[in-house]
Amino acid sequence: GFGCPFNQGACHRHCRSIRRRGGYCAGLFKQTCTCYR
């Protein structure tokens, strides 16, 4: 979701928009957008 697995930048922007420091694509096939604080 949120751009993953192909557009990690979209995931990162989504995470920034919910006041996280950023995000990356995680999981077996990089299909999950994971935010970090």
From Swiss-Prot:
<dbReference type="GO" id="GO:0005576">
    <property type="term" value="C:extracellular region"/>
</dbReference>
<comment type="similarity">
    <text>Belongs to the invertebrate defensin family. Type 2 subfamily.</text>
</comment>
<keyword id="KW-0044">Antibiotic</keyword>
<feature type="disulfide bond">
    <location>
        <begin position="15"/>
        <end position="35"/>
    </location>
</feature>
<keyword id="KW-0929">Antimicrobial</keyword>
<feature type="disulfide bond">
    <location>
        <begin position="11"/>
        <end position="33"/>
    </location>
</feature>
<feature type="disulfide bond">
    <location>
        <begin position="4"/>
        <end position="25"/>
    </location>
</feature>
<keyword id="KW-1015">Disulfide bond</keyword>
<comment type="function">
    <text>Dual-function peptide with antimicrobial and potassium channel-blocking activities. Shows inhibitory activity against Gram-positive bacteria. Does not act on bacteria by disrupting membranes. Also moderately inhibits Kv1.1/KCNA1, Kv1.2/KCNA2, and Kv1.3/KCNA3 potassium channels. Inhibits potassium channels by interacting with the pore region. Does not show hemolytic activity.</text>
</comment>
<keyword id="KW-0964">Secreted</keyword>
<keyword id="KW-0211">Defensin</keyword>
<dbReference type="InterPro" id="IPR036574">
    <property type="entry name" value="Scorpion_toxin-like_sf"/>
</dbReference>
<protein>
    <recommendedName>
        <fullName>4 kDa defensin</fullName>
    </recommendedName>
</protein>
<dbReference type="GO" id="GO:0042742">
    <property type="term" value="P:defense response to bacterium"/>
</dbReference>
<dbReference type="InterPro" id="IPR001542">
    <property type="entry name" value="Defensin_invertebrate/fungal"/>
</dbReference>
<dbReference type="Pfam" id="PF01097">
    <property type="entry name" value="Defensin_2"/>
</dbReference>
